[in-house]
């Protein structure tokens, strides 16, 4: 059997094969390559070989490909309802490459322990209906605002690379409890995430953490020691803005993880909103500048 690679994005041979045949294990692929039961362009290949569009992967007849039997996917009414909202009520932008939604606070981006409903589970329903949506980045469950979703594999690779190469600029608006130590500036720390624990700030020279940089600007004073602050993350570490806000002496209002429980008044919501995203022209050939409307509860403060 000959498989002609049809993806314009270069990919490792082993990863390409496992996308086509999810039941293939890494060990089986490498053994088949050693025995020349799988070759590329009539030559012996390594698992790390990057295949591109037009390459021919030959799989010997003696090699038994593990084919997964199709299973019937079952979706809950909540997942189907959420899927409809993603393509209507939450949708704020769509082109050939991406959609952008205004994710409400309280909705998880991905599933996990004790999470039964998420954007990802709704996308799986849409994909079962013929779409090919792929998550590329995430927002915390408590954070509202702009979430970009790729419409196909090629777009997902381009978008993933864009985040990595800093071709995506994100701006967040937050209501903080307390005023930042300066009206504007830069926060630069390391953030360490250990398995089973929440992220924490560490010294900039700590080799265990990863560099985290955030620009911030005080926009206005509100009331009752509340302030509107703009945050621009240069890096994308887990809980980065929440940790940096706390470090600045102004935890995000409603943040029950990093806020000051003894001083900060109770709030049902965490007031952190992904307000604006700008995609460089280099990503899809045109600049995309998107803005997500603030949730109504922001108006109450």
UniProtKB/Swiss-Prot annotation:
Catalytic activity of the protein: uridine(955/2504/2580) in 23S rRNA = pseudouridine(955/2504/2580) in 23S rRNA
Entry annotation: catalytic residues: 140
E.C. number(s) listed in UniProt: 5.4.99.24
UniProt key word Signal: no
Superkingdom to which the source organism belongs: Bacteria
Gene3D superfamilies the record matches: Pseudouridine synthase, RNA-binding S4 domain
Paired cysteines (S-S): none
A GO term, aspect molecular function: RNA binding
Stored SMART domains: S4
Keyword presence, Metal-binding: no
Any Pfam family the entry gives: S4
Listed GO biological process terms: enzyme-directed rRNA pseudouridine synthesis
Coiled coil: none
Residues annotated as domain S4 RNA-binding: 11-70
Keyword entries, A-Z: Isomerase, RNA-binding, rRNA processing
Stored InterPro entries: PsdUridine_synth_cat_dom_sf (IPR020103), PsdUridine_synth_RluA-like_CS (IPR006224), PsdUridine_synth_RsuA/RluA (IPR006145), RluA_PseudoU_synthase (IPR050188), S4_RNA-bd (IPR002942), S4_RNA-bd_sf (IPR036986)
TM regions (residue ranges): none
Role played: Responsible for synthesis of pseudouridine from uracil at positions 955, 2504 and 2580 in 23S ribosomal RNA.
Family classification: Belongs to the pseudouridine synthase RluA family.
Name of the protein described by the UniProt record: Ribosomal large subunit pseudouridine synthase C
Organism: Rickettsia bellii (strain RML369-C)
């Amino acid at each position: 059997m000959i498989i002609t690679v049809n993806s314009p994005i270069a990919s490792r041979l082993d990863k390409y094969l496992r996308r086509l045949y999810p039941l293939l294990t890494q060990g089986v692929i490498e053994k088949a390559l050693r025995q020349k039961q799988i070759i590329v362009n009539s030559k012996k290949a390594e698992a790390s070989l990057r295949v591109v569009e037009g390459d021919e992967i030959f799989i010997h007849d003696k090699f038994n490909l593990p084919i997964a039997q199709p299973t019937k996917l079952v979706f809950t009414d909540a997942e189907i309802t959420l899927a409809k909202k993603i393509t209507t009520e939450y949708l704020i932008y769509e082109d050939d490459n991406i959609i952008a939604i205004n994710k409400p606070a309280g909705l998880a981006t991905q599933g996990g322990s004790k999470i039964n409903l998420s954007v990802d589970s709704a996308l799986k329903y849409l994909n079962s209906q013929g779409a090919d949506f792929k998550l590329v980045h995430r927002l915390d469950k408590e954070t509202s605002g702009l979430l970009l979703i790729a419409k196909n594999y090629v777009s997902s690779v381009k978008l993933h690379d864009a985040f990595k190469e800093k071709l995506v600029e994100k701006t967040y608006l937050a209501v903080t409890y307390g005023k930042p130590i300066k009206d504007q500036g830069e926060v630069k720390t390391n953030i360490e995430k250990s398995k089973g624990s929440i992220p924490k700030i560490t010294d900039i020279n700590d080799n265990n953490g990863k560099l985290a940089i955030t620009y911030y600007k005080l926009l206005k004073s509100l009331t009752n020691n509340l302030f509107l602050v703009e945050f621009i993350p240069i890096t994308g570490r887990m809980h980065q803005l929440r940790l940096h806000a706390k470090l600045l002496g102004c935890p995000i209002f409603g943040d029950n993880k990093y806020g000051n429980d003894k001083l900060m008044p109770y709030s049902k919501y965490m007031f952190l909103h992904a307000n604006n995203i700008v995609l460089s022209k280099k990503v899809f050939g045109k600049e995309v500048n998107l803005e997500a409307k603030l949730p109504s509860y922001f108006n109450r403060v």
